[in-house]
């Protein structure tokens, strides 16, 4: 059975990633995984236009699977402030991804309410990363 792989990114208003994480967390990084990371960036950014089109046609925040590239599915979540959450995944896990997005949205809102955080700044908070890891293990495994 192939391993389940996930790549999560929060994309800001100017299409720049403000947070990224690979799941499963803790895997050893190899040259091949670095190449995969670059491919994930490409796939995620290529899907942004499709995400924006879907966001205009629905009032739902969770957009489910919006695109597929080779073995990677792309799911998305658009916040009320138009910050995009992108999830690349090799296995269909719609309910788990939806729950993960909802938990990360709540975590992002709490982080964004910090008076020292500027919207669209890169998120470098260890607490935010720990929450993402926790929710990834809880909902994506």
Swiss-Prot record:
Subcellular localization, as worded in the UniProt entry: Cytoplasm, Perinuclear region; Endoplasmic reticulum; Golgi apparatus
Name of this chain's protein: Probable trafficking protein particle complex subunit 2
Cited Gene3D superfamilies: 3.30.450.70
Alphabetically ordered keywords of this record: Cytoplasm, Endoplasmic reticulum, ER-Golgi transport, Golgi apparatus, Transport
One GO BP annotation of this record: endoplasmic reticulum to Golgi vesicle-mediated transport
GO CC terms in record: cytoplasm; endoplasmic reticulum; Golgi apparatus; nucleus; perinuclear region of cytoplasm; TRAPP complex
Domain of life: Eukaryota
Subunit structure: Part of the multisubunit TRAPP (transport protein particle) complex.
InterPro entries on file: Longin-like_dom_sf, Sedlin
Family note: Belongs to the TRAPP small subunits family. Sedlin subfamily.
Matches recorded under CDD domains: TRAPPC2_sedlin
A Pfam family: Sedlin_N
Physiological role: May play a role in vesicular transport from endoplasmic reticulum to Golgi. Required for the systemic spread of the RNAi response.
